[in-house]
Design a protein with these regions (language model features):
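Bacterial N-terminal signal peptides that target proteins for export
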Residues: 1-10
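Glycine-rich, phosphate-binding/catalytic loops in enzymes
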Residues: 178
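Conserved functional micro-motifs across diverse proteins
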Residues: 23-156, 162-175, 183-207, 214-250
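C-terminal motif of bacterial Sec signal peptides marking the signal peptidase cleavage site
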Residues: 17-21
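Classic N-terminal secretory signal peptides
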Residues: 12-14
Length: 250
């Protein structure tokens, strides 16, 4: 199974992260669904949307210090805390990224595989404008890039996995998100998945999210995307196969 690369993970604005590779979950990344929780029984909105948050590193203090100027907050579209819900609303994360909601949809679409049901509840396209060098550096790190151009756009998918079985399962999260015929996101290619490696308890659920890089500099013209969820495991054996492709409308 693959696990979250995890060096940043959880807020919203953009990067959710659970990047590629087989690494521990000791560091948490953050992304655009600030109200999302990786815990199966919780879903709360306590902190503002964030492109990324610092991992436990020497950069942590630097990443927590950004404060927007007064003129940046004197706008009816500014959201100090809470989810970005309407196109045009924006906020700032702690590392200095301005997050502007470009598109949002609530498909509430489901797909099943074995004892698991996946329900996609929200899809958002976020414009991320880095206001600091730290914001650009951490975004590039989170998306496994040498550097990133600002503004950049991220696709965020919020979903819940329901386990209808009598045994706990470890999910491998999202196998891939297909933006179009030529572009596909996965754990090794700019997709940060908070669900990868998490356990869904028997007769329980996991509310979670993922964020991927949609484009740099130019706003993508996405109308639909497709998502495919990976398999799930029990005692290191695959007991749930990957799902079919699920079409999502933005």
């Amino acid at each position: 199974m693959r696990y979250i690369k995890a060096s940043l993970l959880m807020g919203v604005g953009l990067l959710t992260l659970g990047l590629a590779g087989c690494q521990s979950n000791s560091h948490q990344s953050t992304a655009s669904f600030k109200d999302s929780s990786s815990q199966s029984s919780r879903y709360s909105a306590k902190e503002p949307d964030a492109a990324v948050t610092a991992s436990s590193s020497s950069k942590k203090e630097e990443a927590q210090t950004y404060r927007p100027q007064a003129k940046q907050t004197r706008n009816r579209h500014y959201v100090k805390s809470g989810n970005l819900k309407k196109a045009g609303q924006y906020t700032f994360d702690k590392v200095g990224t301005q997050l502007t909601l470009a598109k949002v949809s609530h498909p509430k679409t489901t797909v099943k595989s074995g004892q698991l049901t996946y329900k996609v509840t929200t899809v958002r396209l976020i414009k991320n404008t880095a206001k600091t060098a730290a914001a650009k550096r951490m975004a590039a790190q989170a998306l496994n890039l040498a550097q990133i151009k600002s503004p950049y756009y991220t696709l965020q998918v919020k979903f819940t996995i329901y386990n209808h079985g009598k045994q706990a399962l470890a999910t491998d999260g999202i196998q891939a998100i297909r933006l179009d015929s030529k572009h596909q996101l996965n754990a090794a290619n700019q997709l940060s998945d908070a669900s990868a490696g998490k356990t869904i308890p028997a007769n329980g659920k996991l509310a979670t999210f993922a964020t991927g890089l949609a484009s740099q500099n130019t706003k993508p013209t996405l109308k639909t995307v497709k998502i495919k969820f990976a398999g799930a495991f029990a005692d290191k054996k695959q007991v749930v196969t990957p799902t079919r492709w699920l079409k999502l409308t933005l």
